[in-house]
């Protein structure tokens, strides 16, 4: 670790030698963070040390305005669009109006527990609690209810799904889960109980279910190093100095190995047959390229909101593009258009189809067009509906 004269941590060098840096202002507030790859995020503050803006690794800035109680009142995104937030007298968030005018509301009881949530489509979910503030039920917009039971220590002892299926839980004196039992809607046992055992450090050392018993071993850092299944065969786990999983070793001696970049992103995977898959990432740690052992490559593009906009698959042996998928989104982040083009095996013709979606206020597609058949392309429009 490195420090400034005010004893703020200014640099961290991990066991692999990678360095992350932090810059502070005269009031010891973080103003800039730089990761091991040199990517930066910066922050500004008001006179009350509240964050007023965040500029991310892409250079996009999000701004924040506050009310008299210090609650975030306005959020301004990178395009200048604003979302407005409202609160009750206890500073509970009660209303969010997004940049498109969509309204989400929240309701609370006298204990400040959330009891209603109404989304922008005017669909409401209801919540109830016991006197200790434990969540006892959730009723979704379709009227389906799931319930929760607790013991005197506030530990979850039962969960009943809307279908009537129930799972019960039993604990030891240290609050470790000892047993899970299952019942169907008629109250009859539906699956064999699952039991657990722990060591003095609270680490789970065994589990017994309908498939048999499995045992677990750990290293000094609490990382699992070995799993022994009911067949008495061991699977071992190896880690690098940055705590990333480096290898899984199987009873027959084969293994899966993993390699990572400075930001702990997976960059190479070698499977049990020694076939290699490699991965590339952008500055935001998003996967941008996957190359498989046969040379087949997948390239992925994103927009500023992290939506996938394009996927291109390329043949490893011939180098030709074998499929392309493009996506368009509306301002609410829902897919409104999909274009897919694939190379047809054997004939080398390229059938294409394009799907366009019209989302209603409840995010259900409302329009459907005719299917038009052409000599080389098939163009269709699909419609989808979603439950609550």
Task: List the predicted regions and their residue ranges.
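Beta-strand elements of repeat-based all-beta scaffolds
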Residues: 1-14, 18-35, 39-56, 60-77, ...
């Amino acid at each position: 670790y490195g420090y400034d004269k005010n004893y703020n941590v200014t640099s961290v060098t991990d066991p692999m030698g990678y360095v992350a840096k932090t810059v502070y202002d005269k009031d010891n507030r973080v103003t800039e963070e730089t990761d091991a790859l040199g990517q930066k995020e910066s922050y500004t503050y008001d006179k009350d040390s509240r964050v007023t803006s965040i500029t991310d690794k892409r250079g996009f800035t999000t701004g924040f305005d506050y009310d008299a109680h210090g609650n975030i009142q306005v959020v301004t995104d990178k395009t200048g669009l604003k979302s407005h937030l409202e609160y009750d007298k206890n500073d509970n968030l009660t209303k969010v109006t997004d940049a498109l005018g969509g309204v989400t509301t929240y309701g609370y009881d006298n204990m400040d527990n959330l009891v209603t949530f109404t989304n922008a489509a005017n669909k409401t979910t209801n919540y109830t609690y016991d006197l200790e503030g434990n969540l006892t039920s959730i009723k979704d917009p379709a009227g389906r209810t799931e319930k929760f039971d607790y013991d005197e220590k506030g530990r979850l002892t039962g969960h009943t799904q809307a279908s009537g299926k129930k799972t019960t839980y039993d604990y030891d004196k240290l609050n470790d889960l000892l047993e899970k039992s299952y019942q169907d809607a008629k109250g009859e046992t539906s699956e064999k109980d699952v039991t657990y055992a722990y060591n003095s450090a609270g680490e789970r050392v065994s589990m017994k279910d309908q498939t048999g018993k499995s045992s677990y071993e750990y290293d000094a850092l609490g990382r699992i190093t070995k799993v022994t299944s009911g067949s008495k065969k061991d699977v071992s786990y190896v880690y690098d100095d940055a705590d990333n999983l480096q290898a899984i070793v199987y009873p027959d001696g084969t293994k899966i190995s993993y390699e990572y970049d400075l930001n702990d992103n997976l960059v190479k995977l070698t499977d049990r047959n020694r076939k290699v898959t490699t991965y590339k990432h952008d500055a935001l740690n998003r996967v941008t390229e996957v190359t498989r052992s046969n040379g087949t490559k997948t390239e992925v593009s994103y927009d500023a909101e992290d939506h996938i906009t394009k996927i291109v698959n390329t043949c490893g042996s011939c180098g030709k593009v074998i499929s392309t998928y493009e996506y368009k989104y509306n301002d609410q982040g829902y897919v409104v258009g999909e274009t897919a083009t694939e190379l047809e095996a054997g004939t080398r013709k390229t059938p294409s189809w394009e799907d366009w979606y019209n989302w209603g206020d409840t995010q259900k597609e409302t329009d459907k067009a005719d299917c038009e058949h052409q000599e080389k392309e098939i163009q269709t429009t699909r419609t989808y509906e979603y439950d609550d």
